[in-house]
């Protein structure tokens, strides 16, 4: 079989399909996407079956915007005997290379939520069976492939694998985060997820550390500011609205009632710039580029709101515009973009300069 299975946000299947089709063709890998609206996944069928594994290894997952997880599908099992689902799975995957982790998953849809509890319960016996047949390591092994069982119904599933060096580390491609009780809004989770997805965990003490100065444009009521404050940063919140009093009481927040597109810092001591303003993407992109051009920040996280149509094309266009603007400043900028779980009709973009980050590392 050897197709690709791609998880995405329900309602964004066409964007995921357009993205994988374009990115695969850039690698001379051709096929077509099978799309079912609001399903939360896309199946990409390749004309050359061997190319599914090639894409899973070589197409950089971190560069994909609308795709939450990418794996090779080797088998589709239908009409399983619910009294014994494990035997057909073992038989189908008997020639798999030994895997280091197991993920029993389903789509991120309301309809599939009923399957989630089943998937959790089924994981334990399947894990035991795979280990007994030496298809899964005795302990979780990060450097081995990941075994995926993707249930579409309790008697229907896709079997496959992903590479741990080129996949999402999260179950279903979704970080499991809880909204802090003192957060002014659930948008706080959006920035927290962005940190998990874009900033390597081993660099948090370097790039997300106490004492850093940060700016939050369009801050009110303070969801994103809350994430910066809880990491010990000193934050300038720029917004004409009202900030949550709980944040002001920390003593770490200075609230300026001003236009986020106009205000600029008087000192060159800002490390993080974050922005979640509802505005046309083109305007946001040019503003972000201006901040880096003037050396007003060292690293940025911001959202780009998407139109109702041509969302993939719009996202790619704005990222390429930003890339061009930043190249005029320095060739060392890195741009990452993702539609996060906590994003809706938007994507989150992360920008940093490799040279500036290396200087932080040198100080350590």
From Swiss-Prot:
Keyword Cytoplasm among UniProt keywords: yes
Superkingdom per UniProt: Bacteria
Molecular function GO terms recorded: S-adenosylmethionine-dependent methyltransferase activity
InterPro entries recorded: RlmM_FDX (IPR040739), RlmM_THUMP-like (IPR048646), RNA_MeTrfase_FtsJ_dom (IPR002877), rRNA_MeTrfase_M (IPR011224), SAM-dependent_MTases_sf (IPR029063)
Cellular localization per UniProt: Cytoplasm
A single GO BP: methylation
Active-site residues per Swiss-Prot or TrEMBL entry: 305
Positions contributing to S-adenosyl-L-methionine binding: 187, 220-223, 239, 259, 276
GO CC, alphabetical: cytoplasm
Quaternary data: Monomer.
Name the record gives this protein: Ribosomal RNA large subunit methyltransferase M
Species this chain originates from: Aeromonas salmonicida (strain A449)
Lineage: Bacteria, Pseudomonadati, Pseudomonadota, Gammaproteobacteria, Aeromonadales
Gene: rlmM
